[in-house]
């Protein structure tokens, strides 16, 4: 079966614990990550090492691109301009840093050079913006999914660059002109719970649902800031509509509350 996992953000121990739980119950599990492997969390280096070793375009572990990976790709162009012109660190021309902490991680890992950065830049640049997947559910129905980091725009004629930006950054959850079910991350359900304007089935710190929309970003990296909420790393099974999490299993509850057929 196929499982979509939310934003990792350097939470290596949570990621490994969740993968172990899923794979102990389903040895043939196929895993799709929604991007944002980096920044904020305690073990970005370990997450990156694991990702480069295991994630491929069509293998057991797959992924789409997150906005944090995209921001690094944009920063890399500035870094290379600086490197080609300055050649080394200079007080007059300080090295450009990433908006978040990726460049500091690279520096700490001894990778802050064109050669050192290349494997990570290659990995990020080959992550697709979205994936379409069709599965047969446990009840025998065929369901089309769109796996994306943030949102998918179904209006015809949308320019590619606009679609890519939407895939990475937009927050229009549930407004889809398609029968596909969009599974995404990007906005932690903790944050969505604070937005009174959003008519959204919010379960703070857990996977949340709207019409044709599943948000798997439970905000794992923020769990210390929100001790009153579960705030865990979660996974959604495309075939059974069940959830998996490292700390608790709530699949039966969610299966009874949400289905693409109502």
Stretch-by-stretch model annotation:
Residues 209-249:
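Binuclear metal-dependent phosphoesterase catalytic core
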Residues 40-132:
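Active-site neighborhood of divalent metal-dependent phosphoester bond hydrolases
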Residues 26-29, 58-60, 142-143, 178-179:
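A general structural motif
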Residues 251-262:
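Positively charged, low-complexity/disordered segments
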Residues 1-50, 54:
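N-terminal active-site segment of His-dependent metallophosphoesterases
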Residues 9-13, 39-42, 68-73, 155, ...:
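Active-site environment of divalent metal-dependent phosphoester hydrolases
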Residues 92-215, 219-226:
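Acidic, His/Gly-enriched loop-helix segments that form or flank divalent-metal centers
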Residues 5-6, 31-35, 62-67, 148, ...:
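Active-site neighborhood of phospho(di)ester-bond hydrolases with catalytic His/Asp-centered motifs
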């Amino acid at each position: 079966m196929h499982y979509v996992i939310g934003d990792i953000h350097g939470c290596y121990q949570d990621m490994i614990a969740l993968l172990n739980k899923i794979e102990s119950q389903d040895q043939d599990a196929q895993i799709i990550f929604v991007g944002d492997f980096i920044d904020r969390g305690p073990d970005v280096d370990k997450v990156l090492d694991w990702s480069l070793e295991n994630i491929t375009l069509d293998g057991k572990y797959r992924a789409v691109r997150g906005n944090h990976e995209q921001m690094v790709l944009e920063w890399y162009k500035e870094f290379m301009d600086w490197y080609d012109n300055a050649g080394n660190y200079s007080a007059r021309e300080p090295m450009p840093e990433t908006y978040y902490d990726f460049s500091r991680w690279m520096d700490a890992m001894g990778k802050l050079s064109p050669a050192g950065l290349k494997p990570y830049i290659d990995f990020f640049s080959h992550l697709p913006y979205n994936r379409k997947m069709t599965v047969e559910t446990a009840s025998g129905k065929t369901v089309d999914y769109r796996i994306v980091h943030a949102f998918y725009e179904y209006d015809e004629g949308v320019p590619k660059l606009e679609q890519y930006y939407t895939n990475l950054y937009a927050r229009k959850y549930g407004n889809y002109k398609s029968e596909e079910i969009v599974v995404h991350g990007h906005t932690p359900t903790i944050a969505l719970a604070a937005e009174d304007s959003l008519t959204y089935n919010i379960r703070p710190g857990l996977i949340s649902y709207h019409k044709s929309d599943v948000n798997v970003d439970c905000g794992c990296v923020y769990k210390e800031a929100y001790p009153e909420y579960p705030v865990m790393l979660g996974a959604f099974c495309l075939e059974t509509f069940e959830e998996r999490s490292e700390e608790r299993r709530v699949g039966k509850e969610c299966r009874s509350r949400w289905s693409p057929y109502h």
